């Protein structure tokens, strides 16, 4: 659906998971650049007020340089086909694992 929208001149705000793998991500990002369109992932935790506070505290240096980070997130996943059926390109990592990974990436770059 990302490619369909981009090929029709539409900017894309995509729900996670953005793509299933890196090669797919590179492909749609290249298409967005070629078309000069915005393509981004709608990962809600990235835009929470606490994330802005965390970024501010870290950039101020008030707590020094972080050397270790623990991040986790969990909720009940039973009965959710996108998680339980691998052929749907889901699974726990793409569905919930991305949130703590995104947090770590935001903190450590």
Listing of model-derived features with the role each one plays in the protein:
Residues 45-109:
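Predominantly a Rossmann-like dinucleotide-binding segment in NAD(P)-dependent oxidoreductases
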């Amino acid at each position: 659906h990302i490619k369909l929208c981009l090929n029709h001149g539409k900017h894309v705000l995509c729900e996670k998971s953005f793509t299933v793998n890196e090669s797919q991500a590179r492909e749609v990002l290249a298409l967005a650049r070629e078309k000069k369109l915005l393509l981004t992932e709608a990962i809600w935790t990235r835009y929470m007020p606490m994330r802005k506070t965390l970024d501010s505290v870290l950039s101020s240096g008030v707590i020094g340089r972080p050397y270790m980070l623990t991040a986790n997130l969990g909720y009940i996943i039973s009965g959710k086909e996108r998680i339980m059926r691998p052929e749907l390109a889901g699974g726990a990592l793409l569905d919930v694992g991305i949130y703590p990974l995104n947090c770590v990436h935001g903190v450590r770059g």
